[in-house]
């Protein structure tokens, strides 16, 4: 099985909250695709609660588009990580990490303005696979944590696992 990009960085040294360019690629037509690691929590130390991250997934996707789309950028998808320490965001374009961080913080401020769980988009059995697993309160606690802290930048070169360590860890 090939080693995925996300497993070549040392999770014990990741800062959070922080933005990291996880991957860049070009489509056959020449479009730039960038995948960002939006790390909300320090891996293996903190974790977002499942109801909160699920609600945040519903809110974050729209709010982030409001703040980041335009000027050569269009978000394709924002999805939570299985480890519940962050989200991956795939987009067309190459915005710098600071622009992403500012948009992320603005999106979290928008989450804090939602006043009623019934205002969560697609919160129904037809559009959500687990529509009763939500918590606006938990989502807002996560958002408040981001608003209250500076968003750093994680650099791949600083986090790269050495080749000998990768060989040692490879099964």
Curated annotation (Swiss-Prot):
Cofactor detail note: Binds 1 Fe cation per subunit.
Matching Gene3D superfamilies: S-ribosylhomocysteinase (LuxS)
Leader peptide range in chain numbering: none
Cofactor(s) this protein requires: Fe cation
GO BP terms, alphabetized: quorum sensing
Record keyword Secreted present: no
Reaction(s) catalysed (UniProt annotation): S-(5-deoxy-D-ribos-5-yl)-L-homocysteine = (S)-4,5-dihydroxypentane-2,3-dione + L-homocysteine
GO molecular function: iron ion binding; S-ribosylhomocysteine lyase activity
InterPro entries: LuxS_sf (IPR037005), Metalloenz_LuxS/M16 (IPR011249), S-ribosylhomocysteinase (IPR003815)
Keyword annotations from UniProtKB, A to Z: Autoinducer synthesis, Iron, Lyase, Metal-binding, Quorum sensing
EC id: 4.4.1.21
Keyword Protease: no
Residues binding Fe cation, per UniProt: 54, 58, 128
Enzyme class label: lyase
PANTHER family per UniProt: S-RIBOSYLHOMOCYSTEINE LYASE
Function statement: Involved in the synthesis of autoinducer 2 (AI-2) which is secreted by bacteria and is used to communicate both the cell density and the metabolic potential of the environment. The regulation of gene expression in response to changes in cell density is called quorum sensing. Catalyzes the transformation of S-ribosylhomocysteine (RHC) to homocysteine (HC) and 4,5-dihydroxy-2,3-pentadione (DPD).
Membership in a protein family: Belongs to the LuxS family.
Subunit-level organization: Homodimer.
Protein name (Swiss-Prot/TrEMBL): S-ribosylhomocysteine lyase
Species this chain originates from: Pectobacterium atrosepticum (strain SCRI 1043 / ATCC BAA-672)
């Amino acid at each position: 099985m090939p080693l995925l990009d996300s497993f070549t960085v040392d999770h014990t040294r990741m800062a959070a909250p922080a933005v990291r360019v996880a991957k860049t690629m070009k489509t056959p037509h020449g479009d730039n695709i960038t995948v960002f690691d939006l790390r909300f929590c320090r891996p293996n130390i903190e974790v977002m609660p499942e109801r909160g991250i699920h609600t945040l997934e519903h809110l974050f996707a729209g709010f982030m588009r409001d703040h980041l789309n335009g000027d050569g950028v269009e978000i394709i998808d924002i999805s939570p990580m299985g480890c519940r320490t962050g989200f991956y965001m795939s987009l067309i374009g190459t915005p710098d990490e600071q622009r992403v961080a500012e948009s992320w913080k603005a999106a979290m401020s928008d989450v804090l303005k939602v006043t009623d769980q019934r205002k969560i988009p697609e919160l129904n059995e037809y559009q959500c696979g687990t529509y009763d697993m939500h918590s606006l309160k938990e989502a807002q606690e996560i958002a408040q944590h981001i608003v209250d802290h500076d968003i750093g930048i994680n650099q791949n070169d600083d986090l790269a696992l050495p080749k000998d360590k990768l060989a040692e860890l490879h099964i």
